[in-house]
Amino acid sequence: MKKTLAALIVGAFAASAANAAVVYNNEGTNVELGGRLSIIAEQSNSTVDNQKQQHGALRNQGSRFHIKATHNFGDGFYAQGYLETRFVTKASENGSDNFGDITSKYAYVTLGNKAFGEVKLGRAKTIADGITSAEDKEYGVLNNSDYIPTSGNTVGYTFKGIDGLVLGANYLLAQKREGAKGENKRPNDKAGEVRIGEINNGIQVGAKYDANDIVAKIAYGRTNYKYNESDEHKQQLNGVLATLGYRFSDLGLLVSLDSGYAKTKNYKIKHEKRYFVSPGFQYELMEDTNVYGNFKYERTSVDQGEKTREQAVLFGVDHKLHKQLLTYIEGAYARTRTTETGKGVKTEKEKSVGVGLRVYF
């Protein structure tokens, strides 16, 4: 019998939890190790940098390792520590194909209660993460972080006491600061100060509802970035992300519409506005095989200046060979038209296709 999409989603979470290995479980303390090794073979072509030939690569695609320790105090109270590492070196550096240096992607502690919610402190995802419904494995065409940061150095609160509903709020703190002289310090920047162009602080609030075949999510964020050497001059980003979707459970089909709007207020220069809309779908073609895709239209404009319009499409198919083995093929195409006063119209195109394999552990 064909599974419903809701059952697939529940099963996916269960499988994710099952992939982690419990290495210690005693007196209310549980320690899990898990992760995945991901490889992708791809062909890509872009006119952005006047590239004329296709480039092929075999590289890392988001391989990761995590350790999670949870201690239950009783009466629904718990504490949790989480650490996740990633590979960060670019393929163009040292011929590493993205399997170079290892860094901490997320590192945080959580204090919570099943009835009252939880407080999370550290480098973690924010409530803005997972707002949009579009599915992708590698070539996602939605740039959510241009609207609201989806992770960072944060203090956050999340409430999950109502079935299907998640409420959350985050306060973002500066994460990237200048080092001392001789330690990658930029000219004219003060050691210990926030780097120019990086997050100074910010706030986010959001709500996510996913039940009764309805998906509705929305988040708002106000983020301040350091603009120049003066601590008083900031670049402020106000953004909204939202999604609305419906599951046709009997058909194994999810249809959704993602959207976003943002306005960037710059010090002494023209402000910038952007928005996007993106219809998408996810369909269970057969057991353990899914088809997904989405289209995006995005427009960016500077007051009385440059205007950019981007159209992009993504399509993919994934198949679970085993509960811990996933393979997929995915492709994306994007065309960007930039209009600037006195310079005419410039068109840029990008296309990529890849075949990937993920082994979970």
Curated annotation (Swiss-Prot):
Main location class: membrane
Q: Answer whether the UniProt record assigns the keyword Lipid biosynthesis to this protein.
A: no
A cellular component annotation (GO) from this entry: cell outer membrane
Give the UniProt record's GO annotations in the biological process aspect: monoatomic ion transport
Any one Pfam family here would be Porin_4
Record-level Gene Ontology MF annotations:
porin activity
Q: How does it sit in the membrane?
A: Multi-pass membrane protein
**Compartment(s):** Cell outer membrane
Q: How does it assemble?
A: Homotrimer.
Its biological function? Forms pores that allow passive diffusion of small molecules across the outer membrane.
Q: PANTHER family this protein is in?
A: OUTER MEMBRANE PORIN F-RELATED (PTHR34501:SF2), PROTEIN YDDL-RELATED (PTHR34501)
Question: What is the name of this protein?
Answer: Outer membrane protein P2
Lineage of source species: Bacteria, Pseudomonadati, Pseudomonadota, Gammaproteobacteria, Pasteurellales
